[in-house]
Design a protein with these regions (language model features):
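Thiamine diphosphate
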Residues: 1-162, 167, 178, ...
Length: 310
């Protein structure tokens, strides 16, 4: 691991490249450009940037209209506001007609920290995953966030991409894998337990696997960056190989990655199964590291939970 960079920062940098090479891409924000990092586009290419103020629903409806004219709108706001305030518009104005709009939501999960439970969205993956035809992505690091941003610009259809406020380690060497929509990446092979993780929890899962190795437990770690459509073939293969499955997400254990993996395995693979995430609770204010620990989402806590459930 090397530098720590937030996935939202990589997203902002990728947008600069996109608008410079693709004249169809436009960037929309709802008065949070400095936080979502779309400010980079606003400064470098103001003709490509639209600030709608605190009006997320209007922003999404406008993006839907833009898409009918052949543009590729990237809408940015906090996950709480995308999944909360603009949900009807995302469902009915974007997904229902299957318009080519990208909803890129930052500040997701409890790692938002001091902003508190009102802003720590732990329901967004579930809400977006249930919308018919919606592709749902949660990058693990800055490199993957940039690659995903570039990839979804070329993908025709509605996309929800979940991004983080917190700066986290950028993968290096063998950990850097190609980003292909709908294809999981195996970051560590193992035979005793398969850990399926997404977003910031991928790095924590790798650290947890190191802890498990000290006790002779050989854990595989698989990065599920595309939660929908999930890589069912990969999930099935590793569940069958290990016979024990753990899912890890900085999201409610209801409706997110854990349920997506369970849907694949149910009735097909006989294995032990346990979900690690936020257990039917709201978040709370505090430093990101402290809040993650409060919800059992640090590597040492995860290792202990995994040992107790395999």
């Amino acid at each position: 691991m090397a530098d720590k960079i937030a996935t939202r920062q990589a997203y902002g940098e990728a947008l600069i490249e996109l608008v410079e090479k693709n004249d169809k891409v436009v960037v929309l924000d709802a008065d949070l450009a400095n936080a979502t990092q779309t400010c980079k586009v606003a400064k470098a290419h103001p003709e490509k940037f639209y600030n709608f103020g605190i009006a997320e629903a209007n922003m999404v409806d406008a993006a839907a209209g833009m898409s009918t004219m052949g543009l590729v709108p990237f809408c940015s706001t906090f996950a709480m506001f995308a999944a909360g305030r603009a949900y009807e518009q995302i469902r009915n104005s974007v997904a229902y007609p299957h318009f080519n709009v990208k909803i890129c939501a930052t500040h997701a999960g409890v790692s938002v920290g001091e902003d508190g439970g009102s802003h720590q969205c732990i329901e967004d993956l579930a809400l977006m995953r249930v919308i018919p035809g919606m592709t749902v992505i949660c990058p693990a690091d800055a490199n993957e966030a940039k690659a995903a941003t570039m990839a979804i610009a070329d993908f025709d259809g509605p996309v929800y991409m979940r991004l983080a406020r917190l700066a986290t380690p950028v993968f290096e060497g063998d950990m850097v894998k190609p980003f292909v929509l709908g294809k999981a990446n195996v970051l560590r092979e193992g035979k005793d337990v398969a850990i399926f993780a997404t977003g910031l929890m991928v790095n924590e899962s790798l650290l947890a696997a190191d802890e498990l190795a000290k006790d002779g437990i050989d854990a595989a770690v698989i990065n599920i960056h595309t939660i929908k459509p999930i890589d069912a073939e990969c999930v099935t293969a590793w569940a069958e190989k290990c016979g024990k499955v753990i899912t890890v997400e900085e999201h409610s254990v209801i409706g997110g990655l854990g349920d997506a993996v369970a849907d694949v395995l149910m009735g097909k693979v006989n294995c032990k199964f346990h979900k690690i995430g936020v257990n039917d609770q709201f978040g709370q204010s505090g430093k990101a590291a402290d809040v993650l620990r409060e919800y059992g989402l640090t590597a040492d806590q995860m290792a202990a939970t995994i040992k107790a459930n395999i």
